[in-house]
Design a protein with these regions (language model features):
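Transmembrane beta-barrel strands of outer-membrane/channel proteins
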Residues: 183, 208-212, 225, 239-245, ...
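Transmembrane beta-strand segments of outer-membrane beta-barrel domains in Gram-negative
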Residues: 205, 268, 273-429, 559-562
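Outer-membrane beta-barrel "beta-signal"
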Residues: 227, 536-562
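Periplasmic polypeptide-binding modules associated with outer-membrane biogenesis and secretion
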Residues: 33-214, 220, 226, 242-259, ...
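Residues on the lipid-exposed face of transmembrane beta-strands in outer-membrane beta-barrel proteins
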Residues: 225-229, 263-267, 306-310, 358-364, ...
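Residues that define the transmembrane beta-barrel architecture of outer-membrane proteins
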Residues: 190, 219-223, 257-261, 300-304, ...
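Extracellular loop and loop/strand-boundary signature of outer-membrane beta-barrel proteins
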Residues: 155, 212-213, 246-251, 290-296, ...
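Outer membrane beta-barrel transmembrane domains
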Residues: 287-289, 325, 329-346, 355, ...
């Protein structure tokens, strides 16, 4: 019996990207469509027995999925009655059909040679299994990575839905472009093999970008270079490196001593996608706005992190996972070359914290809707020599929520997107743990970091209206009317709750995965007294442009593996 699975590329239906798995089942080769076994007499079951017997009972052997009582329900109408040879075959078919209807496609019932004089029919259940996974092409990704993830989802007996889920989860992997598979019979009854042809995505990507996502006080514009790999050592590990050049206005790029970079590495540890994540971020800045530029204020911030991420539950629509992260941050501020405390909580210009963060995540996907939510519980630790003033508790607690709802609202791929950001703490926290409101990623129309508070709430609904599509119907240009609302307050101290909100329009252009352009203009409904209000952000303009490419396709066909 042969079943073929053909995987298609991710597609956008109603404007929402979904991962679709198409299944085409072929009639078993060498067997009639009805799947009738040879006559019972040829199997030696009947011998010299009469053409009909009184069926007093049925005994099952080898069944683990369904109980004897459940299988007897399928044939109870024939018990106590005279049955012919053909009707015995009908009993076998009914049991086999029950397995197939429940997606156990290589399981079924077998009637072996036996004595029916006592009226007891013995049926042997063959519960099929997946014996081998043959990767029929060779790429940079190790074939064991793929085999383990198939066997992770597929148990014994083999269920077609479990196999489809395993293939779907593999195809969602960012390293995989598409897969083609065929389920073929093995050498033994109930045994099946899975043949796979896996097309990997290109392994490396590189690019450049420019944006104005920094506070104008330190130079809003920045240029960046980025490099990444989806499979560094063929173990499925990823590496992302980003280097940023700060920019003073639009006039001069600072290639001096500034060190602004980030490095993130992740490595899957088990077939259950337990993943180790390591991170390093370095950020330097200098105050450039008058009159504070004369003070020569500089800051150096560094962050180290180590995390374990574990998916707990996954199916075609739902995914729930938990991340446990340890993070260490340190910051130093210099004024005219000397350490100086500017932000609350710092000691002699230095702040140092260590935190444990627990982050449950949930994702729901359907053709019309995507919902994603993450909540992070952060616990300050009195470890690795934390530095802060005595009025700040080293063992602090914060609770942050990030959520988004994407809904297809029209047939022309118009999307409604609602974003929610939230942070709560019952005590004052140092500035590196506070929440920033204002800027491209929170409240458009205001400066980046317009407000910095202990607690905050941001709600941002927007429509994404496609105004230009390619010849395949994929939206390339979206027009985005939006409304942003945010409020923030400190747990203690003089700054009361403050609310800002804006409305505006944006345009995005995404012709490929590695070309992304976005421009937003937002009207701020609240004015702030800013001495130097000549930055683009002061006019409500935010922009971002990233251009890159990927390279090195490692896939080539090698044929079946023994």
């Amino acid at each position: 019996m042969r079943f073929r699975f053909e995987s298609i590329k991710p597609s956008c239906v109603s404007g929402i990207c979904r991962l679709a798995l198409a299944l085409v089942a072929f009639v078993p080769m060498g067997v009639s469509q009805e799947g009738v076994l040879p006559p019972l007499k040829d199997l030696g079951i009947v011998g010299d027995e009469p053409a009909e017997i009184v069926l007093k009972g049925v005994e099952f052997d080898g069944n683990t999925v369904f109980s004897d009582a459940e299988l007897l329900e399928l044939v109870k109408e024939r018990l106590g009655k005279k049955v012919s040879i053909e009707e015995l075959e009908g009993v076998r078919k009914a049991v086999s059909k029950h397995y197939v209807d429940h997606r156990y496609v290589n399981s079924g019932a077998v009637i072996d040679e036996q004595d029916l004089a006592g009226g007891i029919l013995k049926i042997r259940i063959v519960e099929g299994y997946l014996d081998a996974v043959n990767v029929m092409n060779e790429g940079w990704l190790r074939s064991g990575y793929l085999r383990k993830r198939v066997h992770r989802e597929v148990g014994k007996p083999l269920n077609l839905d479990d196999l489809k889920l395993a293939l779907e989860l593999i195809r969602r992997d960012e390293k995989i472009r598409k897969i083609n598979t065929a389920l073929v019979p093995g050498d033994e009854l109930g045994q099946s093999h899975l043949d796979m042809i896996v097309t990997e995505k290109k392994v490396f990507d590189v690019g450049i970008g420019i944006s104005n996502r920094r506070p104008p006080s330190v130079g809003a514009e920045e240029a960046e270079m980025f490099f990444g790999t989806k499979n560094l050592t063929s173990l499925g590990d990823t590496l992302r490196v980003n280097y940023t050049f700060t920019q003073e206005g639009m006039r001069e790029i600072d290639f001096g001593d500034a060190r602004n970079y980030s490095v993130f590495y992740s490595l899957p540890l088990t077939r259950w996608d337990t993943t180790l994540e390591l991170g390093l971020t370095q950020s330097d800045y200098a105050i450039l706005e008058e009159p504070f530029d004369a003070l020569d204020i500089q800051s150096d911030t560094r962050m180290y992190s180590v995390a374990l991420r574990q998916p707990i539950y996954r199916d075609f629509q739902h995914e729930f996972s938990v991340t446990l992260k340890g993070e260490h941050r340190r910051s130093e501020v210099l004024v005219s070359g000397e350490r100086f405390s500017i932000s609350p909580g710092s000691v002699d210009g230095q702040t140092r914290i260590t935190a444990l963060r627990i982050s449950p995540e949930y994702v729901y996907r359907s053709q019309e809707r995507v919902i994603a939510a993450r909540t992070t519980f952060s616990f300050g630790l009195d470890k690795l020599d934390p530095i802060m003033t005595p009025d700040f508790d080293r063992k602090y607690f914060t609770w942050m929520t990030q959520a988004s709802w994407v809904e297809s609202v029209t047939k022309n791929d118009t999307l409604l997107i609602v974003k929610l950001l939230h942070q709560y703490t019952d005590q004052s926290v140092v500035s590196m743990e506070q929440f920033s409101l204002g800027g491209m990623n929170t409240i458009r129309g205001y400066r980046e970091n317009q407000l910095i508070r202990d607690n905050a709430l941001v709600i941002s609904p927007e429509l994404r209206i496609p105004v230009y599509k390619d010849r395949y119907g994929k939206p390339l240009v979206y027009l985005i009317p939006f409304f942003d609302f945010g409020t923030g307050w400190n747990t203690e101290g003089p700054k009361d709750r403050e609310t800002i909100y804006s409305a505006g329009l944006g345009v995005t252009y995404n012709p490929s995965d590695y070309v992304n352009m976005a421009v937003y203009w937002g009207h701020a409904f609240k004015d702030f007294d800013i001495p130097n209000d000549d930055d683009l952000q002061d006019y409500g303009i935010h922009f971002q442009l990233r251009i890159g490419t990927d390279f090195w396709d490692p896939t080539h066909y090698i044929g079946p593996q023994k």
